[in-house]
Design a protein with these regions (language model features):
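Catalytic alpha/beta core domains of metabolic enzymes, predominantly
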Residues: 2-86
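C-terminal alpha-helical cap/extension of soluble enzyme domains
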Residues: 48, 52-138
Length: 138
C-alpha cells in the first residue's frame, strides 16, 4: 500500500492494524519518505526517484537498516530538492530535473503550457544543487 496522504497519524493507525509480515507499506511523499521508513514503511514510490535516484535510495537503504541519523540526513537532502521543485507550477521542475537521473527526459506534462514553466533562476538553482550532489549537469 502506497501512502501519499502526508497524514502520519493515519499511517501509524494503519500500521497498528496490519501484520507487517503479510502487508507492506510504501511511502509516497518525497517530503516524508524518511519519516515513513522509520515508522515501518519498506520502501517508497517517488517521482523524485526519477531525477534523483541516489538520494531516494539512500533514504530507503538507511531506513531499512534502522539507521535513523542517515535516513534523516538523506531526507534533508531530498527536502532541499523538493523545496526548489515546489517553486514551479505543478510538476514542471521535476520534469526539468529528470535530466539528472540519466533516464528518459520528459518534455511537457499534460498540463497547460503555463503550468510547464520553470523560471531560469530556478533552473540554475536546481542545476547547482544537482552539481553539489554529484550529478552531471548538461
Amino acid at each position: 500500500f502506497k501512502d501519499a496522504s502526508v497524514d502520519i497519524l493515519n499511517f501509524i493507525q494503519c500500521t497498528l492494524r496490519i501484520n507487517p509480515d503479510e502487508f507492506d507499506f510504501l511511502g509516497g511523499c518525497d517530503g516524508l519518505d524518511g519519516v515513513m521508513m522509520q515508522l515501518g514503511a519498506v520502501g517508497c514510490v517517488s517521482f523524485m526517484a526519477v531525477p534523483f535516484p541516489k538520494e531516494m535510495k539512500d533514504i530507503v537503504d538507511a531506513g531499512l537498516a534502522g539507521d535513523y541519523k542517515k535516513c534523516m540526513e538523506a531526507q534533508h537532502k531530498v527536502l532541499r530538492i523538493r523545496n526548489l521543485c515546489k517553486q514551479a507550477p505543478f510538476n514542471a521542475a521535476w520534469i526539468y530535473a529528470m535530466k539528472y537521473g540519466g533516464g528518459p527526459v520528459g518534455m511537457h506534462s499534460r498540463m497547460p503550457k503555463d503550468q510547464d514553466f520553470v523560471p531560469e533562476m530556478l533552473k540554475t538553482q536546481l542545476d547547482d544543487l544537482a552539481k553539489e550532489y554529484g550529478y552531471d549537469v548538461l
